[in-house]
C-alpha cells in the first residue's frame, strides 16, 4: 500500500471516530469496515458497545468478527434471559446461541418449551443440540474412572 493510500485510510478512520462520537454508527461502521486494517481494537470495541446499546445485535456480532474483538457474551446472555422471561423463545434462543449459553440456560429454555405442547419439536431439537450431546461424554468419563 502506498504512503498516500495509507494516509487516506488513517484520515478515513479518524473521521469514522468522529462519526462514532456523534452517534452516527452506520457511517462509522462503513468507514471502519472499508479500512479495517487501520482501525484500532478500542475503536471496534466502542462501536460494538454503542451498537449493543441500541440493541443492534447482528451488526455488533458482525463488527466483532471483522474487528477481531470479543463478542459481548455476557450482554447477549442477559438479553436472552430477558427474552425468556417475556416468553419470547425465538429471541432467547437466538441470543443464547450468539452468547454461547451454558447447559443450565439451555435446560431452562427446554423446561419452558416443554410446558407448551406446541413447542415439542423445538424442545427436542434444542435438547439434542445442547443437552444430550454433553451427557455421553460425562458417562464415558465416569465409566473410565471406575
Question: Predicted regions span which residues?
Answer:
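Positions within ordered alpha-helical repeat solenoids
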Residues: 21, 34, 53, 66-69, ...
Amino acid at each position: 500500500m502506498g504512503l498516500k493510500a495509507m494516509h487516506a485510510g488513517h484520515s478515513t478512520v479518524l473521521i469514522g471516530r468522529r462519526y462514532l462520537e456523534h452517534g452516527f454508527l452506520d457511517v462509522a461502521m462503513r468507514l471502519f469496515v472499508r479500512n479495517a486494517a487501520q482501525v484500532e481494537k478500542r475503536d471496534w470495541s466502542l462501536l460494538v458497545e454503542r451498537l449493543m446499546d441500541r440493541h443492534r445485535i447482528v451488526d455488533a456480532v458482525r463488527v466483532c468478527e471483522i474487528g477481531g474483538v470479543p463478542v459481548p457474551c455476557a450482554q447477549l446472555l442477559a438479553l436472552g434471559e430477558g427474552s425468556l422471561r417475556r416468553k419470547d423463545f425465538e429471541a432467547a434462543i437466538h441470543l443464547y446461541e450468539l452468547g454461547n449459553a451454558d447447559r443450565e440456560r439451555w435446560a431452562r429454555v427446554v423446561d419452558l418449551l416443554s410446558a407448551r405442547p406446541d413447542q415439542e419439536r423445538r424442545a427436542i431439537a434444542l435438547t439434542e443440540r445442547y443437552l444430550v450431546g454433553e451427557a455421553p461424554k460425562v458417562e464415558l468419563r465416569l465409566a473410565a474412572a471406575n
